[in-house]
Amino acid sequence: TAANYRVNVPGIANLLIAHTHIAPAPVEVTEPAGPIAYWFSGGPPPGANLTERVNGTLADGFIITDGDVDDWDPMNTPDSGTVAGLIRAIKEGRASVVVHTDDLDPNTPTGVAGDSRAGELRGTLQ
């Protein structure tokens, strides 16, 4: 079992991290997005901040082994932390990608383009 992915972004600056969240229910009816299952960029904090603007493909590749996936719900989901579980969550509409940005300037108001630690871009994985 493997998953192929590509994350495209429209000219984003100050990329901090990008990852997949797995929610307990379909993303459009649950808040928050759920625990992190896979890191596209930046890795677990403190990841490196990318200062150049990214326009187009941010990340692409394959998720092949269960070791590539974080265990997002070990108590309640038998296939949590597996590639098969990630694929099932995507098919069920429970997986989303969140791209966080930060200009690393404490004087910049958060939530503006290029400085949104809460997630500048969000979308359901398909």
Model region roles, listed by residue range:
Residues 1-126:
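N-terminal leader/targeting pre-sequences
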